[in-house]
Each structure stands twice: as C-alpha cells, then as structure tokens.
C-alpha cells in the first residue's frame, strides 16, 4: 500500500494555553477518483458521519531559512468559524513520516488576523492557501476509533485520509496494521506522504510552465 505517514501530535508548546501531553497520530493518505464511492464504502462498514467543513490552510515561510528545505511548516487554519495556528516539525525518521505537531486555537477571525501580523513581524510571508472541502467519518471498536477524512482539495483533487491516534510508540505498529486492513477493505492503494501544499505548488508550477509565456523569472512561491 505504499508509504505510511506517522505524525507525533503535541499540543502547543506554550504551556499557558495547552497541556504538554504527546500523542502519536498514525496516518495513511490515498488519492481517489470517486469520493462518493468511498463514502458508500464507509457507510457500509458502519462509520458515522461527523459532518462537512470548508477549510482554508494558509502556509507561511521564512525566506531567509526556507521552511521547505528545513521540512517544517507553519500554518493558520480556518475550519468554518474556527481558527488554529499549527507548527509541524521535520520528519524524524528516514523511512516513515514522524513529525512533531504543535497546535494552538485562535479565538476568532480577529485573533487569526493578529497572528498573521505577529508572523509578518517575525519575517514570515504567506506562501499559499490550500482550500478544501472535508467530510469526516469515525468508526470505533472496543479498542480505538479511526477517523476518515474525505478531502476535495482545490487545484489538486480528491483524497482520503485514515487516522488513528495512539498514546505510545508501542501502539504504532498495531495501528499501522489496522489502517492497512481498513484501506484494503475500502479498496484503496497508492498511498502518499506528499502534503497538500506541496501538491498545490507543484500543480501551479506545472500549469505555469505549460502556459504560452512560460514561467516568470524570480517568482516567489
């Protein structure tokens, strides 16, 4: 089934706001041709819909450091009327995708705009905004709950993410096996660890290269 992405999720490093407990998120992501087909499969397996949200993920970069080369990410996410600041650290494993994730809720749109000002004051610039429609399902057994995200990403395509959170490293391997089995049941194959931001920028670069005028010089991503 390809590569398996593993992310370590940790609440915000600012102890004032969020606790210090670590979580390990095991994730598989697959491109799909038909979201509707996967939705039907999930419903037949008994997964429960948690609703639909429209998400806008705005990513930022420090031009002097180049976050892409450092393999880190800073973003502000708007999910309907909720806002979050997220930092994703570099991959911690050469074979699997293991990342530290630090996330802090922002009170409202004004707080999100103020945070953009803070990031700008630190020298960060907006790179791109990833827009997607996300429909979430959850399926639980006696041991755990698996979250399924059906994503329709603007300029990129359709994807399904399978996510399972465990509390210790010992739970990672069983979680991977469980997700692989579920992916088989859903008929999914060809998993990817490429982020939506990377896909979006690659798509835009390809479109620009194919345009009659070709790529513009010194374009800032």
Predicted regions located by residue number:
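N-terminal amphipathic/basic-hydrophobic helices that include classical n-h-c signal peptides
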Residues: 1-22, 215, 219-220
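Short, flexible, solvent-exposed loop/turn segments with mixed acidic/basic and small polar residues
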Residues: 15-21, 90-94, 148-156
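N-terminal strand-loop-strand beta-hairpin
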Residues: 21-143, 180, 186-221
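Charged, well-structured binding/catalytic surfaces in domain cores that contact anionic ligands
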Residues: 134-158
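A generic structural motif
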Residues: 165-170
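Acidic (Asp/Glu-rich), glycine- and aromatic
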Residues: 173-182
């Amino acid at each position: 089934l390809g590569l398996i992405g593993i992310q370590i999720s940790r609440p915000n490093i600012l102890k004032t706001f969020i606790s210090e407990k670590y979580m390990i998120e095991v994730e598989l992501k697959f491109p799909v041709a038909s979201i509707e087909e996967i939705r039907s499969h999930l419903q037949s397996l008994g997964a429960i819909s948690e609703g639909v949200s429209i998400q806008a993920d705005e990513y930022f970069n420090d031009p002097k450091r180049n976050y892409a080369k450092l393999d880190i990410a800073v973003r502000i996410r708007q999910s309907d009327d909720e806002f979050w600041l997220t930092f994703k650290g570099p991959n911690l494993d050469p074979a699997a995708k293991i990342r530290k994730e630090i996330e802090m809720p922002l009170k409202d749109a004004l707080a999100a705009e103020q945070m953009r000002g803070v990031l700008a004051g630190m020298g960060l610039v907006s790179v791109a905004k990833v827009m997607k429609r996300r429909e979430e399902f959850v399926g639980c057994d006696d041991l755990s709950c698996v979250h399924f995200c059906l994503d329709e990403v603007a300029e990129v395509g359709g994807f399904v993410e399978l996510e399972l959170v465990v509390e210790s490293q010992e739970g990672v391997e069983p979680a991977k096996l469980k997700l692989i089995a579920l992916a088989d049941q859903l008929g999914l194959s060809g998993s990817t660890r490429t982020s939506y931001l990377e896909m979006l920028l690659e798509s835009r670069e390809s479109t620009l290269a194919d345009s009659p005028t070709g790529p513009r010089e010194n374009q800032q991503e």
